[in-house]
């Protein structure tokens, strides 16, 4: 696997699923994972057979790391993306890109200045239902569309917000269910 693209996944809440995806993707190599929760980082690393650290910066000087995948709370994306881009790594961030325009712009500017790729992972676009709608529209099932509106009802209990400490906050989630 000498030509494999080396990944580090930062933030192992939902990020553990992304790490598993990288692990089973041909042409990709999961070099490591990082999380501020040492026990979680170690557990995921042991499961997937990779290195772990509590500080993502530990991976930034490594030539075998090409991509940093940021899966932290939304309001922390720039804190990880900007130094990763400065270190010459490509970056994928989960949606939303960030919680303020200024922080998102800083990420874009850093990527452009360092000639690195910055991608936003809008994972819901790949759900089966989304693809079925796309296919139906492409096949003209609804005729010529002028406007399409959709609604997604997604219930989140108070426990969902309370157990994380960051979900639903303006600082780290950008407005809760309105943004994420």
Give residue ranges: language-model regions.
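N-terminal Rossmann-like dinucleotide-binding module
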Residues: 1-47
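Conserved SAM-binding strand-loop segment of SAM-dependent methyltransferases
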Residues: 49-58
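Hydrophobic Val/Ile/Leu positions in short beta-strands of Rossmann-like dinucleotide-binding domains
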Residues: 7-11, 70, 93
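Beta-strand-loop-alpha-helix segment that lines the small-molecule cofactor/substrate pocket
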Residues: 67, 73-74, 78-125, 140
């Amino acid at each position: 696997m000498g030509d494999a693209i080396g990944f580090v996944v930062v933030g192992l809440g939902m990020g553990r699923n992304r790490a598993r995806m990288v692990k089973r993707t041909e042409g990709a190599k999961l070099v490591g994972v990082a999380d501020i929760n040492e026990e979680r980082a170690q557990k995921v690393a042991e499961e997937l057979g990779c290195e772990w650290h509590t500080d993502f910066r530990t991976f930034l000087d490594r030539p075998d790391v090409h991509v940093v995948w940021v899966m932290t709370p939304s309001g922390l994306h720039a804190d990880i993306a900007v130094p990763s881009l400065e270190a010459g790594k490509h970056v994928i961030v989960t949606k939303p890109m960030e919680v303020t325009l200024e922080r998102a712009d800083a990420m874009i500017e850093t990527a452009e200045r360092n000639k690195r790729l910055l991608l936003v992972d809008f994972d819901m676009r790949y759900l089966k239902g989304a693809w079925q709608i796309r296919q139906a529209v492409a096949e003209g099932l609804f005729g010529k569309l002028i406007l399409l509106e959709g609604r997604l009802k997604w219930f989140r209990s108070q426990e969902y917000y309370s157990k994380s400490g960051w979900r639903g906050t303006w600082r780290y989630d950008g407005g809760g269910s309105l943004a994420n």
